[in-house]
Regions:
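A structural "domain/chain start" motif
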Residues: 8, 14-64, 69, 87, ...
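Compositionally biased, intrinsically disordered linkers/stalks adjacent to structured regions
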Residues: 141-164
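Second-shell loop/turn segments in exported
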Residues: 37-45, 135-145
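Surface-exposed short loop/turn segments
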Residues: 19, 61-63, 72-120, 128-140, ...
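Bacterial N-terminal signal peptides that target proteins for export
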Residues: 1-6
Length: 164
């Protein structure tokens, strides 16, 4: 009899938790992820598209949610805005030249359960990475920005799908 109850409780948790570690309420079946809004002063014009694609990849491939193109028809809505982009020296060498630069991107996220009209997550995220501006130049900054976006997508996904 005890084994039956333990099995029942274990299976009951599966309605909310997936084996990828993503906890999604069982009544949510679809998610809309509109194009990320970019309010930053980044020299790269496609940060919004890159972050949108990274988020879609995570939420669709690592959960049971399906992508809904119409935000009003989706069970869940993930809205993201890039608020700030900085590229600042962190180490200065001879002749006052930057030897290391840090790219920092700050975003604001709002994740809403539209079925129950409940905000599941609303907060800012910030991530940074460093590169060598002398050796890597603008291409190094661009690659570093891509890495920062990947880190942000991971952080957003983890926060939105974790219960802790």
């Amino acid at each position: 009899m005890w084994l039956w109850w333990i099995g029942w409780l274990a299976l009951g948790g599966c309605a909310y938790y997936s084996f990828t570690g993503a906890a999604i309420p069982s009544h949510l079946q679809t998610i809309a992820i509109p194009l990320v809004e970019d309010r930053s002063n980044s020299p790269f014009t496609n940060l919004d598209q890159q972050l949108t694609e990274l988020l879609i990849e995570r939420f669709v491939n690592q959960t049971r949610l399906t992508l809904e193109p119409d935000p009003e028809a989706a069970d869940a809505l993930l809205e993201v805005r890039i608020d700030r982009y900085t590229n600042e020296p962190t180490a200065v060498g001879g002749a006052e030249r930057a030897e290391r630069n840090r790219v920092t991107i700050t975003v604001t996220v709002r994740y809403v359960d539209q079925v129950n009209d409940q905000v599941l997550l609303e907060r800012s995220f910030s991530a940074f990475e460093e590169y060598d501006p002398v050796a890597q130049g603008l291409a190094g900054e661009e690659e570093t920005a891509r890495l920062v976006l990947r880190n942000l997508a991971d952080d957003i996904f983890t926060a939105a799908t974790s219960n802790w």
